């Protein structure tokens, strides 16, 4: 039997338990308290979650949830929805909310490709008032808004975000800083003004100067970088060099003791191969060196009417002589005819013969085979495949009209032209040239390029006799998706896909916005094309005219030069007057056939590139000043040529400053 004390105690507990149960039930029926909101922190949930919280929250928290939803929508590439939410934010925001709103507005504008407006907003934000997470987004927005051109704000943004990054992002940031610095021109670097307390930036600028002063000598560059690391031990790049400079630490000079020269010494291409071989041999023996005596120029390029600066087509304007001297060595060269055996067999034979470097092949079908032909030999191909592969032992050196068109795209862009029309011959050659130009044009930020084809000289004569001019119209050049598509934007580690490309708008009027015409024509064709353009345009709307070296041949007298008044054209430095003695020697050898003279020059530069193969392959920015152009290598070792440009003025040919 239970004691009366126990019964009373148990009975006393009943009301307490009942009250607790009732309280628990009431608590369960009450609405849940929403989680705390911190708009300055990470926003890792999806937009649906934040939008749901926005609907369920009280008025005090609605703006916070809406700001988080906008961030999530941008992360999910739902740009229109993000813009709609941003436009409906309440006007009475707190200072913290206002900062987040401005940061989101800048990120939205970047996603919409309106980087100038984004940069204006970012310039008004005070970074010191932002949280660590917001600072990362702020600096990455600064980088995205200034990515079109290397500027001081862009470089400062890279430097400022470095302490906020972790793991692999550190190296990516260092590489991005270096890439931006490398795009600065010498003039921009020399005129740059920085604050006295910007020690990290000063270190970066000194590293750039070390690189620019010594990049032509790998050993000096190695020593310079090591000294820089000692002087700037706290700089992020002192601990982790940019990837491009890390390669220099591992630089090794490849042997050129035995060179295999692969050319089509028989068949239809023999005449071209012979010219290249003779140039290669002349450079090897030093005969091209004796002809390379610098001639002191007596021109004043800034004066368009200075007759001391002008010469006829037979005596091109004197330009500075190449600063990269041809290499004279005791290398052995053995020549192989690519028309006698398959390419794979020739490469195997060359390796068996002890070759350490291959120069060639020349013809594009054989160059296309290189990537599928296993060989450990270093190879300097004398042409370029349609799609180059980044093979660590192959470089590509082409003297092609496509290569010249790519240089023309840069020249027209530097001349502030933005609406070019290409006049190219009908057929495969014209299509290749147009595509090469348009690809390079769009890489620089240019828009649609228009193309117009022309037929034979007979057709042109018929048109001009009928009084028909050439109207400034054309069809859009079809370019590769990689070149044509705008890049996506990454902000705070979030990649926003590029917007769809609108269909190009084609000018249909001769009084449209075309401001430049690039013409690929022979002298006889250009003689007809230029007056036909003049017939169809007024003097006020006349575009600038540019031509390729195809229009510059021997035998063009003063009448032709007068007719070509104002046209700018490009050619290799040898033809532009960099070395008159060598030009005279080569012209005599080939009876003034300028096409063969250019191939002879290609052979000279092929020798120079062969002897600097390791530098071109391993040192970014290494340059050979050759007789076919200023030669540099892309990341996949495609040799690019920067050409001199000349202009017809008052019956003379003058170099452009």
From Swiss-Prot:
Keywords for the protein's UniProt record, in alphabetical order: Cell outer membrane, Cell shape, Lipoprotein, Membrane, Palmitate, Peptidoglycan synthesis, Signal
One GO CC annotation: periplasmic side of cell outer membrane
Subcellular location: Cell outer membrane
Residues in the signal sequence: 1-25
Main localization, broad class: membrane
Lipidation (S-diacylglycerol cysteine): 26
Family matches, as HAMAP family: LpoA
Record note on quaternary structure: Interacts with PBP1a.
Similarity annotation: Belongs to the LpoA family.
Stated name of the protein: Penicillin-binding protein activator LpoA
Lineage of the organism: Bacteria, Pseudomonadati, Pseudomonadota, Gammaproteobacteria, Enterobacterales
Encoding gene per record: lpoA
